Amino acid sequence: MPDKILDDISHRRYNPLTDSWLLVSPHRTKRPWQGQQEGAAVTTLPEYDPKCYLCPGNSRAAGDQNPNYEQTFAFVNDYSAVKEQQPDYEVDQSSDDLESLLLRAQGVKGVCYVLTFSPKHNVTLADMSAKDILPTINHWTRLYANHLSPSNPLSAVAAQLQLPISKEEAPVPKDNYRYMQIFENKGAAMGCSNPHPHCQAWTTSTMPEEPGKELVQMAKYRQQHGRHLLADYIKLELAKEERVVWQNDSFVVVCPWWAIWPFEVLVLPKRHVRALVDLTADERLQLAEAIQEVTRRYDNLFECHFPYSSGIHQAPLDGTPEEIENAYFHMHFYPPLLRSATVKKFLVGFELMAEAQRDITPEQATIRLRACDGELYRNKLS
């Protein structure tokens, strides 16, 4: 840290990705906890569940039947948050009347996908090897490539992709969209409605708030300094090492300086990668290795099925050449657990009304996660 005194005093830290601040209160880690505790997650699941709408061969809510897939499978969400077919909503926003100023709305079209990680109902990414995770990353890449606007400079890169042939082809959209958000909610504590290992990909005609804020900040930084914000940040973290959890030749996992969640991590490529389609075959495998390392260490930390929300931020599907070039691929992991398998962090009170706050410092979290290397804890129990 810049000054060891920050280990003991309350202070604020700046997040250059979102142009925001958070309060850090390391002295509060000693306070007793008498609040809510989460129930321990169920850990015994069958390899196949005849009632699960994600297992191979089963029927889904809308009546469609899943194929007997062997690796990954993607389909349009039966309960999509956005739709491809709906009336256009056009409103004149140029008027200065109060309704136009204060009651603004914007129509959003899109399509939401569900993508399974494995045909097995009882595994998570932490249980899978990097080679087992790789087909999911390949499928993410196909899905992203299929949705790129023809005018996007990345379309030419996507056309040269050589991905392994898959029995389950990635869906193709009916329209061009602005952004694709790939994310996973793992565990009931994060609102996951089905324990079968899966993620989602939502494509929208508008730019969502979080990646939009990051793209604005990355553009400003590059304009001011002539370099990429995250490239400079990686250089700094690799030199200092105190927040580096793990790394391989292509990726580094850090507990970011500005982390809000207790054991939040950021997965970053060591070279400028704009989007999934920029990754080489070896880099996709090394990304799978990074994801496996993060999720295994999470589970080992409190010896539980560690809940989290994770997501990929990358270049838009449709954007100017400059906007695409400003983008820097990265993956966020936001886990809620704080002290044990049953005590989680709540974003309430001061954090809702004022600004984000954390107790354990990212440097302390890094030390804890580094120590969670090794075999997955539950494999030692069997």
UniProtKB/Swiss-Prot annotation:
Binds 1 zinc ion per subunit. Zinc binding seems to play a structural role. Zn(2+) binds at C52, C55, H121, H196. Its cofactor is Zn(2+). Fe cation binds at E214, H313, H330, H332. GO terms for cellular component: cytoplasm. Its EC number is 2.7.7.12. Signal peptide: none annotated. CDD domains: GalT (cd00608). PROSITE patterns: GAL_P_UDP_TRANSF_I. GO terms for molecular function: UDP-glucose:hexose-1-phosphate uridylyltransferase activity; zinc ion binding. UDP-alpha-D-glucose binds at A61, N77, D78, N185, Q200, K345, F346, L347, V348, F350, E351. The active site is at H198. Belongs to the galactose-1-phosphate uridylyltransferase type 1 family. Homodimer. Essential for growth on galactose but not for cellulase induction. This is Galactose-1-phosphate uridylyltransferase. It comes from Hypocrea jecorina (Trichoderma reesei).
